[in-house]
Curated annotation (Swiss-Prot):
<keyword id="KW-0689">Ribosomal protein</keyword>
<keyword id="KW-0687">Ribonucleoprotein</keyword>
<dbReference type="GO" id="GO:0022625">
    <property type="term" value="C:cytosolic large ribosomal subunit"/>
</dbReference>
<dbReference type="Pfam" id="PF00831">
    <property type="entry name" value="Ribosomal_L29"/>
</dbReference>
<protein>
    <recommendedName>
        <fullName>Large ribosomal subunit protein uL29</fullName>
    </recommendedName>
</protein>
<dbReference type="InterPro" id="IPR036049">
    <property type="entry name" value="Ribosomal_uL29_sf"/>
</dbReference>
<dbReference type="InterPro" id="IPR050063">
    <property type="entry name" value="Ribosomal_protein_uL29"/>
</dbReference>
<dbReference type="InterPro" id="IPR001854">
    <property type="entry name" value="Ribosomal_uL29"/>
</dbReference>
<comment type="similarity">
    <text>Belongs to the universal ribosomal protein uL29 family.</text>
</comment>
<dbReference type="GO" id="GO:0003735">
    <property type="term" value="F:structural constituent of ribosome"/>
</dbReference>
<dbReference type="GO" id="GO:0006412">
    <property type="term" value="P:translation"/>
</dbReference>
Length: 66
């Protein structure tokens, strides 16, 4: 997801999305270990999505406007 799309979500929606992305990342890592993962870029994309969500939550916490 793009940061602009994430900024339109509420904090509660962002927290739910963050938990979902963390579960997805865990599943991708398990698939990688088991040799079932075919698209390795999904791991890095998911990690970047998690970072974007955390950044937006932190910006809101600090009151930074973008």
């Amino acid at each position: 997801m793009k940061a602009a799309e994430l900024r339109n979500l509420t904090n509660e929606e962002l927290m739910n999305l963050l938990e979902e992305k963390k579960r997805t990342l865990m599943n991708l890592r398990f698939q990688n270990v088991l040799g079932q993962l075919t698209d390795y870029s999904q791991i890095s994309k998911t990690r970047k999505d998690i970072a974007r969500i955390k950044t937006i939550l932190r910006e809101r916490e600090l009151g930074v406007r973008r």
